[in-house]
């Protein structure tokens, strides 16, 4: 039986801060003293199986070529008419398609529950054999009922069950899967039933995955929401803060984050943060006048929900929620072939600290998934950094990203230590066509951001607070430039900062960039990122060049509780 966050939550009283923190802290502990390793990954990428432009094997090869330690095949649910090489399913002899008959583009489609199980998974096994030092997960991009997209993956005790479990999830809960042929089918994961229309169905899906994880039907899983600003608010098919709170409440061990930095970073709108226009005063708004949202696109390649200090992400962290931030390529088609994308690992990476729990000298699928859930992760653009340690310490108590430090009373001297490293070069190549110049990846400054933790919000007792996507207590409390750090013999840059008399519960997170404050059309006077549309509008810088000019990294938070 898995250790259940959900069951602890049922016992804990929502009204008290400290019981809420205990409720949220259950599960893998980022503070464990076990030996581990930082591993780079990408878990959102597409092939010819769905709407990608290149073969399955090609995308796996690129993931390996750009040095990723792990990745997930994670492409759309529903139904598609071709395999991973672009061959139409209905040209196979004999025709292998199961389920209800449906056609797209003049060819019969195969429902994704079948292709994931019967065709994609065997290719994932081949990939694992071809790249034995890498880890290739079985995943898919869930079309979320009532909303947009989400990256999911499952790890099972018997690896062959990865595919059957994710097939059962897709069949039941993907809003684009119209097949009904498996209704009432008995599986190791329960009796299948279509539950794929409303937001409530999406919450049920998170609950289903949580139950499978708790009951041992699967070893591990993640549900991480993708390009979360692209469709705007929930009323227009996107997400509101209460949606994420609902998902996390239903599946605290599996639904634990989102992509703060969307893929498609070469696109004019840096990941479709929603299309926008900017006026002569630099005010950026949605390009469609009748759209009831205004996110202003991406800011330094990062969506509004994450980039806005005191915004939606901070609202969730202010509850003490273990809700973490990730980044991926969302590769479909490379920019040199007319697409909007970098290859997996070429530009954005999510770094996960995986712990070798069984001491075998390797890092398993389970250990990597546990690392993601721990929150001891960060993401970076363009290899701005390739190593980050972020710790808070009070005497002999210490916590890393995703972890918590609990003090019996006010902390007289909270020590914050940041250790980071940048490589000499990255993957930028000045080809004279798409990219005219490349700069070395070098951090200009790092912001230390903090906010108060006030406890979980009860949606029944505090309905207005539950839908509030802000945390007004969040602020930048310190900024560190090159004169603030020392470089050790290994080339690591080390920052030590002391915060005096901490008498309330708080969280701390980092962001860093290669850009100075007041960089025209990129940052404001204090270094906050500006809407990415400005530099295109005012200077004509766009595409891959814009992305390589404008590099950021974001850490995940440390939680400090004062009783």
Question: What residues fall within each predicted segment?
Answer:
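Short, structured patches in soluble enzyme cores that scaffold and shape functional sites
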Residues: 227-229, 262, 356
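Bacterial N-terminal signal peptides
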Residues: 11-21
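Short, solvent-exposed beta-strand-terminating loops
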Residues: 77-83, 159-162, 260-279, 515-521
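Substrate-binding cleft/loops of secretory-pathway carbohydrate-active enzymes
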Residues: 145-163, 230-256, 333-353
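Bacterial N-terminal signal peptides that target proteins for export
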Residues: 2-11
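A metal-dependent hydrolase metal-coordination microenvironment
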Residues: 27-237, 307, 328, 519-520, ...
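C-terminal functional module detector
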Residues: 26-38, 46, 50, 56-60, ...
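Histidine/acidic residue-rich metal-binding segments in metalloenzymes
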Residues: 195-224, 237-254, 275-292, 304-320
């Amino acid at each position: 039986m898995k250790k259940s966050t959900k069951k602890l939550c049922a016992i804990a009283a929502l009204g008290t801060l400290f019981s809420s923190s205990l409720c949220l802290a259950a599960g893998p502990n980022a503070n464990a003293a076990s030996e581990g390793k930082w591993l780079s990954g990408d878990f959102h990428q597409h092939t010819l199986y769905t709407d990608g432009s290149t073969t399955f094997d090609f995308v796996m090869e690129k993931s390996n070529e750009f040095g990723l330690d792990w990745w997930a095949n994670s492409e759309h649910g529903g139904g598609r008419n071709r395999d991973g090489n672009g061959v139409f399913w209905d040209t196979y002899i004999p025709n292998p398609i199961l389920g209800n008959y449906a056609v797209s583009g003049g060819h019969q489609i195969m429902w994704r529950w079948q292709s994931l199980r019967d065709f994609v998974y065997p290719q994932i096994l081949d990939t694992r054999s071809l790249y034995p030092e890498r880890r290739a997960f079985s995943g898919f991009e869930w079309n979320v009922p009532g909303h947009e997209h989400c990256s999911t993956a499952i790890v099972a005790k018997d690896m062959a069950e990865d595919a059957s479990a994710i097939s059962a999830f897709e069949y039941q809960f993907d809003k684009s899967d119209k097949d009904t042929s498996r209704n009432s089918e008995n599986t190791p994961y329960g009796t299948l039933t279509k539950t794929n229309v409303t937001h409530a169905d999406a919450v049920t899906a998170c609950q289903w995955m949580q139950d499978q994880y708790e009951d041992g039907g699967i070893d591990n899983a993640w549900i991480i929401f993708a390009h979360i600003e692209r469709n705007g608010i929930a009323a227009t098919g996107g997400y509101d803060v209460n949606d994420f709170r609902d998902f996390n409440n239903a599946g605290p061990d599996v639904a634990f984050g989102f992509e703060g930095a969307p893929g498609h970073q070469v696109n004019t709108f840096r990941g479709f943060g929603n299309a926008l226009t900017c006026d002569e005063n630099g005010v950026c708004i949605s390009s469609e006048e009748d759209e009831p949202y205004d996110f202003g696109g991406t800011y330094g390649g990062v969506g509004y929900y994450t980039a806005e200090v005191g915004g939606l992400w901070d609202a969730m962290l202010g509850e003490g929620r273990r809700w973490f931030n990730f980044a991926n390529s969302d590769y479909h088609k490379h920019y040199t072939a007319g697409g909007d994308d970098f290859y997996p690992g070429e530009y954005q990476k999510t770094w996960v600290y995986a712990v070798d729990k069984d001491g075998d000298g390797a890092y398993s699928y389970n250990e990597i998934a546990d690392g993601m859930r721990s929150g001891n992760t960060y993401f970076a653009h363009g290899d701005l950094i390739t190593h980050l340690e972020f710790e808070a310490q009070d005497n002999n108590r210490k916590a890393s990203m995703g972890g918590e430090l609990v003090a019996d009373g006010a902390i007289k001297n909270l020590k914050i230590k940041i250790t980071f490293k940048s490589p000499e070069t990255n993957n930028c190549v000045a080809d004279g066509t798409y990219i005219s110049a490349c700069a070395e990846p070098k951090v200009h400054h790092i912001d230390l951001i903090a906010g108060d933790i006030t406890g979980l919000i009860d949606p029944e007792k505090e309905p207005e607070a539950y839908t509030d996507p802000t945390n007004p207590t969040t602020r930048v409390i310190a900024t560190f430039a090159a004169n603030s750090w020392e470089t050790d013999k290994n080339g690591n840059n080390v920052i030590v900062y002391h915060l005096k008399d901490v008498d309330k519960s708080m969280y701390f997170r980092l962001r860093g960039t290669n850009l100075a404050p007041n960089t025209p059309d990129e940052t404001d006077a204090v270094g906050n990122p500006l809407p990415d549309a400005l530099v295109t509008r005012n200077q004509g810088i766009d595409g891959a060049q814009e992305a390589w000019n404008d590099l950021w990294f974001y850490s995940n938070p440390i939680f400090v509780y004062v009783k």
